[in-house]
Amino acid sequence: MFKATTILAYKGKNGSIIGGDGQVTFGNTVLKGTATKIRKIGKDGKVLAGFAGSTTDAFNLFDMFEKCLESAKNDLLKAAVDFSKEWRKDKYLRKLEAMMLVLDREHIFLLSGVGDVVEPDDGKIAAIGSGGNYALSAARALDKFGNLNEEELVKESLKIASEICIYTNNHIKTYAIWDNK
């Protein structure tokens, strides 16, 4: 189901970053290598989001989440909870095959395919998709032992995932929210 991508989100000291690879896979065929599966959303682009799973389903979820974010006046926590409530109530949405990561400078959430809202234990690193566990492991190690800035950490972690996961490539795109920029 989620064999099409890797998305990694990192909330560091100076900024929040989301990154994703560009590979779109259908079965055992690579359809595209330069897809964009991350976005800046919300008022002034102060929320970052990325998806893994069915593209059509993910676009529906993006639209729904943006509406929740707008209703919540860019309050990511409230929007995530409201989004989860809507997801669980709607029979059609419960069948969507997609997951999302959303983050701002305060919060980071994984929105699961069944409407769960999960904040990572460390409150700063989350990953989804077929290469998600590889990217997550690399990011945790680089965060703990490395000396990289936030964007470099995300890019290097995704590159490591692309070397292991056949559904992830090294065409990496990132979006950032910086504290002083």
From Swiss-Prot:
Protease subunit of a proteasome-like degradation complex believed to be a general protein degrading machinery. GO terms for biological process: proteolysis involved in protein catabolic process. This is ATP-dependent protease subunit HslV. It holds the Pfam family Proteasome. Its main location: cytoplasm. Disulfide bonds: none annotated. The active site is at T5. Belongs to the peptidase T1B family. HslV subfamily. Allosterically activated by HslU binding. It catalyses: ATP-dependent cleavage of peptide bonds with broad specificity. It comes from Campylobacter hominis (strain ATCC BAA-381 / DSM 21671 / CCUG 45161 / LMG 19568 / NCTC 13146 / CH001A).
